[in-house]
A protein has these predicted regions:
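Trp/Gly-enriched beta-strand/coil motifs that build multi-repeat beta-propeller-like domains
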Residues: 1-203
Length: 203
């Protein structure tokens, strides 16, 4: 949702293997109807879209970018397909990956959940636009546990973290119910031992 309508929109990026142009384009949707559309800009393909949450709390989805070569993070604050403002957040080493962009502290602004792929540490940035208002560590979790979603599972207005164990063979799923970067409570969901079943989305 990039235009303050209730309907979700579709962000396209031309980044395929054959002559990618880096074009970014948005369809503004009403059901199956594209009621308007527009090109945002062209961005070189070493930049990847890593999220599209509302970073500044204006009710419009923004675009979070990360550069594959050097770990630089950049945000577009959007008004429809127009970049209202933009700025660099910071640069983070490449062994850290963006694992979620939920609103973990319930302030109406999307945040960034990081995971260190070397040691399993999880860390959060609480954002105000492209500024880091505050940050904090969640904890360190063994690498056989993977972050698979960050929905608001208990309805308190704050995004939570869904974990899945993909290594031990039992397919355990576990939830952290978050209050900022603090784990307010946690618990097992169930086990899905058939690894042919994968979590593809959280709603």
């Amino acid at each position: 949702m990039t235009n303050q309508q209730r309907e979700s929109d579709i962000l396209w990026r031309h980044s395929g293997p054959i002559a990618p142009t880096g074009q970014n384009h948005i369809w503004f949707m009403n059901g199956t109807t594209i009621f308007s559309q527009g090109t945002v800009n062209f961005v070189t393909t070493d930049w990847e879209v890593k999220g599209s949450g509302d970073l500044n709390g204006d009710g419009k989805s923004d675009i979070l970018w990360r550069r594959a070569g050097d770990g630089r993070n950049h945000a577009y604050l959007m008004n429809g397909n127009v970049i209202a403002s933009q700025g660099t957040i910071n640069t983070v080493p490449l062994n850290w990956v963006i694992a979620g962009t939920g609103d973990y502290n319930g302030d109406g602004k999307s945040d960034i959940l990081w995971r260190n792929t070397s040691n399993g540490r999880a860390h959060m940035y609480f954002l105000n636009g492209f500024a880091i208002a505050s940050q904090g560590t969640v904890g360190t979790v063994p690498l056989e546990w993977e972050i698979k979603g960050d929905g608001d599972y208990n309805g308190d207005g704050k995004a939570d973290i869904l974990w899945r164990n993909m290594t031990t063979g039992d397919g355990r799923n576990y939830m952290y119910f978050m209050d900022g970067n603090v784990i307010a409570s946690s618990g097992y969901v169930n086990a899905v031992s058939n690894f042919d079943f994968v979590i593809v989305d959280v709603r």
